[in-house]
């Protein structure tokens, strides 16, 4: 199993070349490249040469021995519920991000489902998401890349606490992947998101329920079950022995991909200390990969 580091913070701070160098020196196998900057009009991936720019990024990371193995589509758009904005701007940008990820060499890109709203039922959102993802299918086929659906959460606007959202329940998550019914759609389990809405299921329960055939991607991070902290494993309350046991027992074959908030790790740290911080993150991840391998049971 490959150990992958999320790159959004490091690339924004240091640029692609230096970020790739540091992650390679820390011992990671590959990276998850964020395309979040595409919400900004001046992002290079919004320009006419976006494929060439993406290919350049892919070459940089490959040359350092840490290829882009996963990407993340942009999602911090305004006006998701405005059908005109979604049709004319949001969807085309997400589709372009899929093309850019493929040009980098990523075999998979995580694309958030549309969220629940206060005025729509879960079934209505399910139907909208089926159209949304299926509209991406021609792009996936043309580029040879898989889209991973992620489990989400949201906050109650009146009370401020976390509540359920698209794919936040294991049964609904499985339904999404099964209904899409294509080799181009898989599940990305965000381990930290599972425990935020109130429910009995834990992250390892999701692993077992999604199973070997659906689960092909991860977002690895920790929290206190109250806030989406994106901490380093063991900094919160998630039981990592149970997570790794479940991954091994379903014979998970994807990457072990971090989605850590680097501001929480690095903070005001001087750049010369970044290598030490990355080695710390790497060593924990490598230990969790080893635990997963110890538990691995080959699927038939």
Pin down the residues of each PLM region.
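Glycine-rich, proline-tolerant flexible connector loops at the mouths of alpha/beta enzymes
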Residues: 34-58, 119
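Active-site-proximal loop/turn and secondary-structure-junction residues that shape catalytic pockets
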Residues: 9-11, 35-37, 74-77, 113-117, ...
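Short Asp/Glu-rich motifs
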Residues: 42-43, 80-81, 120-121, 159, ...
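Aromatic/hydrophobic pocket-lining residues that form π-stacking "cages" and hydrophobic walls in ligand
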Residues: 19, 57, 97, 136, ...
């Amino acid at each position: 199993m490959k150990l992958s580091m999320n790159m959004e913070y490091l690339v924004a701070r240091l640029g692609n070349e230096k970020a790739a160098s540091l992650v390679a020196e820390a011992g990671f196998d590959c990276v998850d490249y964020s395309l979040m900057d595409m919400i900004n009009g001046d992002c290079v991936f919004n320009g006419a040469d976006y494929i060439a720019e993406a290919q350049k990024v892919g070459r940089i990371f490959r040359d350092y021995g840490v290829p882009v193995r996963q990407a993340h589509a942009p999602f911090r758009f305004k006006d998701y519920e405005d059908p005109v904005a979604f049709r004319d701007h949001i969807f085309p940008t997400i589709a372009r991000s899929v093309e850019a990820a493929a040009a980098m060499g990523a075999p998979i890109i995580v694309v958030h489902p549309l969220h629940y709203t206060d005025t729509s039922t879960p079934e209505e959102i399910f139907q909208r998401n089926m159209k949304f993802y299926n509209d991406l299918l021609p792009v996936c086929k043309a580029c040879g890349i898989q889209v991973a659906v992620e489990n989400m959460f949201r906050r109650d606007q009146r009370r401020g606490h976390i509540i359920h959202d698209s794919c936040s329940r294991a049964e609904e998550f499985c339904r999404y992947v099964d209904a899409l019914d294509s080799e181009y759609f898989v599940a990305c389990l965000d381990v930290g998101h599972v425990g935020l809405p109130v429910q009995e299921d834990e992250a390892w329960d999701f692993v077992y329920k999604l199973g070997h055939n659906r689960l092909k991607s991860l977002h690895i991070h920790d929290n206190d079950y109250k806030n989406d902290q994106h901490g380093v494993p063991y900094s919160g309350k998630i039981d990592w022995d149970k997570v790794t046991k479940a991954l091994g027992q379903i014979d998970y074959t994807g990457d072990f991909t971090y989605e850590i908030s680097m501001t929480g790790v690095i903070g005001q740290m001087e750049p010369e200390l970044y290598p030490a911080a990355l080695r710390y993150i790497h060593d924990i991840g490598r230990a969790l990969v080893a635990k997963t391998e110890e538990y691995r049971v080959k699927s038939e």
